[in-house]
Structure formats: C-alpha cells, structure tokens
Amino acid sequence: MQIRRRPNPVVAVQELRFQVKAPDATPRNILEEIVWHKEVEVEQMRERAPLLELRKQVQTAPPPRDFVAALRQAQYQPALIAEVKKASPSKGVLREEFDPVAIAQAYATAGAACLSVLTDEKFFQGSFTYLNQIRQAVHLPLLCKEFIIYPYQMYLARSQGADAVLLIAAILSDQDLQYFLKIATSLGMAALIEVHTLTELDRVLNLEGVSLVGINNRNLENFTVDLQTTCDLLSKRWDQLDQRNILVVSESGLYQAVDLQQVQTAGAKAVLIGESLVKKAADDRFSHETDRMQAKISALYS
C-alpha cells in the first residue's frame, strides 16, 4: 500500500494564486483521507502549542511506564491492550454515552495489561484530552493511538502522558520509521510499529531498535478484516521475530475466545481489542462499567 501525501496548497502572491496540480487531488482510500486531513490538523496544532512549549512540558512530565514489560508480565496471555475508542470510520459511533475515564478504569480493574487511547478527533472522535484525563486516572501504560506523520505528534503524546506511540508502516517511509523510532526511544516511549502485509513486515525487520510489531488484521484501505493476516505473516517471519525478541501484537477483528486462541497459537503475545469491549450488547444488563468489562474480558479468556 502506498499512501500519498496531501497535494500542495494554493499559495497567494498579491493578486495571483498558484498551485502545483497533483495528478489526482482526491484521496484514494480512507487511510489516505485521514493522512491528508492529519497534515492540516498538525499545522493547526503547532500554532496553538509550538514544539518548544511541548518540549518543556515533556521535560517536567512524570517518567514513562514500561509498556513492553507490562505486556510480558501480564495477568492474561496473550496480554490485553484494551482500547478506549468511541467511533471508527467503518462502524460509526460505538457508544453514545461515552466516558473515557470510566472505561479506562474498568479495563484496569478487569485485568488489562495496557491501554490504547484514540486521539484522532475527526475520524474516531478521540482526543488528546482523553489521553491526559486517563493518565491522571489509571496506573497502566498508555499507547497513544494516533496517525503519526510528524515528530511533533510524538512530543504531544508524551506531554499528555503516553508511554508508547503507534507508527503505521503504510504511511511512513523507512527513513521516517527509523527516525521516529529514535525519537520514541529518546523520550522513553515504546513504539508499536503496525504492519498489514509481508512487504511492510520485511521493511520493519530491516530497522534497528524494534521491540514491538503490531499486525493489523484490518486492511486500512477498505477496512475489511481477516484474522488469517496475523497467522500468515507470523508463519512466514516467525524465526526472524523470535530471534530478535520482538513482541507481536495482533490487532482488530478479535471478538471471542477462539479468536484469541487462533492468533496466540500463531505466535502473537498480545492482542489489541477495542470495538468488542466498548460496544454494548443489545441485551446488556450491567449497571456498572467495571462489571461489564470484567464479564467481557473473562469471556475472551475463558
């Protein structure tokens, strides 16, 4: 998958307006649309909070928690990264009455090893404010689930309490992946590098300093899901991953115990689950969030 960057903006010079026309000025898929919007969004973020200001906040922030160690020492196996997620482009709003802190606290009580917090506003109705609020409320390591295309976003994530960041191979060059890995390390954060294809996995295996790889069972071009993605990639590259002690996380499409067993048998040491936990069943009988999450997570590991 090759994700293009946003076409050059129109530049006004006195009475004239110039733009280098792109061959195709509309996004080809949802992932490309997200990336193009993210470029504009980050420009606006920089105006509100300059990088220099974020660097100062990072310097005075509490030290990050060890995300990878938490997965290796988890109560459940495969270790659970439970996601705080209100909506998605494919499923729309997952829950109308959405309290991110209550959900995060319920996950922690129910045995999650780490949490993932969506921060994209336009497409997932997430927020960096949610990340900060959850950091104040729970002790677990936090993954900032963001479409990172600039180092600025990594500093913002750390300033708001993130212990790990997501790097998506499909939207970053090899050079950017390696550079962003170094930035994450310098900030004390783990980097979960997400892949969907064998080509992307091979690119990641050529990088230095990789400790976490996420295999997304969802095709981000069309949002179809196939658990066999995790199984196929691990069957082809298990030896290289194992030799380097890289912990593999299976992401998306995990709804029941048999799904977890399938990816664990293939070699995944952790799973990232959001939709099936956040979404309420039609016959939901729980009055407390903690009871609901304990029941759901217990069922996944039964």
Swiss-Prot record:
InterPro entries: Aldolase_TIM, Indole-3-glycerol_P_synth, Indole-3-glycerol_P_synth_dom, Indole-3-GlycerolPSynthase_CS, RibuloseP-bd_barrel. It catalyses: 1-(2-carboxyphenylamino)-1-deoxy-D-ribulose 5-phosphate + H(+) = (1S,2R)-1-C-(indol-3-yl)glycerol 3-phosphate + CO2 + H2O. It holds the Pfam family IGPS. SUPFAM superfamilies: Ribulose-phoshate binding barrel. One of its GO terms (biological process) is L-tryptophan biosynthetic process. One of its GO terms (molecular function) is indole-3-glycerol-phosphate synthase activity. Keywords: Amino-acid biosynthesis, Aromatic amino acid biosynthesis, Decarboxylase, Lyase, Tryptophan biosynthesis. The keyword Transmembrane does not apply. This is Indole-3-glycerol phosphate synthase. Its EC number is 4.1.1.48. It comes from Cyanothece sp. (strain PCC 7425 / ATCC 29141). Transmembrane segments: none annotated. Pathway: Amino-acid biosynthesis; L-tryptophan biosynthesis; L-tryptophan from chorismate: step 4/5. The keyword Amino-acid biosynthesis applies.
